């Protein structure tokens, strides 16, 4: 049996570029445990330039091959691609649209599902349409006096708010605001990251995460894990990835009843099916002191860094990451044939 030429595409040039490289390390080491794959790792920078790990400039052509700038190097045909790119253009659906155009099979959610989940406004509309509870919010489409007034009214009504760029990940462009005098500047900062902004009511709650993925034709939802931050903090970009972070994670959340755990998992599977996700996702929830469950967000290409929850929860559920990748890829390529 010939080996599968697998393109591991990483980076992307967004604010999450370096995190994507860390996740790619995990994918690369996992794929190396199987003799089924011949892996070429290529980094995409913010200028749209492709480079191999060896530094060779190249491009992914519509003939489904990597063509090198050094013409003495033979083109490398691509059978399959893993777009290990957090944020733009990986989780936004953009690069998946290109793969669809050139008919290149790829790992992860398809373009429309990726786009719907990445945009916080679209996602919340989907959550509500599916009957899944989520945090109260308003959305703003431009930075002006009216937007500032709406955000200040929301703060007055809710006591504390989050102002979030609608299309960013890893808490980029996300700010907790308790002081009305800071609303205008924070709103301006958020609009610097995206053309739309979401203002959400601050929810004092536990932050629970569920890994939801396809395994041998079944949609699997793990037991909820938990992100635990210092009191009065939230899981910022720095809290996620800085060495000084005091946040910790429990692969299985403690003191969550079986009934609540099963309801969270049911909501997660409902979201996965309803939004037509594919292969993998991490679905995040709030659990309040009153045991109210609120869907927070869906990550269509969850991080796979040393501190990331998705691979830990998958492994805790009894599945091996390399075997999982092999099953998904082989099933997909077999269906294509």
Curated annotation (Swiss-Prot):
Q: What is its main location?
A: cytoplasm
Residues that, per the record, bind Mg(2+) 1: 284, 297
What does the note accompanying the cofactor annotation read?
Answer: Binds 2 magnesium or manganese ions per subunit.
Per its record, the protein catalyses:
2 D-alanine + ATP = D-alanyl-D-alanine + ADP + phosphate + H(+)
Query: Which cofactor is recorded for it?
Result: Mg(2+); Mn(2+)
Q: Name one GO biological process term.
A: regulation of cell shape
InterPro entries listed in its UniProt record: ATP-grasp, ATP_grasp_subdomain_1, D-Ala_lig_Van_CS, D_ala_D_ala, Dala_Dala_lig_C, Dala_Dala_lig_N, PreATP-grasp_dom_sf
Q: Which GO terms describe its molecular function?
A: ATP binding; D-alanine-D-alanine ligase activity; metal ion binding
Q: E.C. number, please?
A: 6.3.2.4
**Binding locations of ATP:** 154-209
| Compartments, as annotated in UniProt | Cytoplasm
Cellular component annotations (GO), alphabetically ordered: cytosol
Q: Record-annotated residues binding Mg(2+) 2?
A: 297, 299
Q: In which pathway does it act?
A: Cell wall biogenesis; peptidoglycan biosynthesis
Domain ATP-grasp, chain residue ranges per copy: 124-330
Keywords associated with the record: ATP-binding, Cell shape, Cell wall biogenesis/degradation, Cytoplasm, Ligase, Magnesium, Manganese, Metal-binding, Nucleotide-binding, Peptidoglycan synthesis
The record describes the protein's role as:
Cell wall formation.
Family label: Belongs to the D-alanine--D-alanine ligase family.
Name-wise, this protein is: D-alanine--D-alanine ligase
Give the species this sequence originates from. Shewanella sp. (strain W3-18-1)
Source organism lineage? Answer: Bacteria, Pseudomonadati, Pseudomonadota, Gammaproteobacteria, Alteromonadales
Q: Which gene is this protein's source?
A: ddl
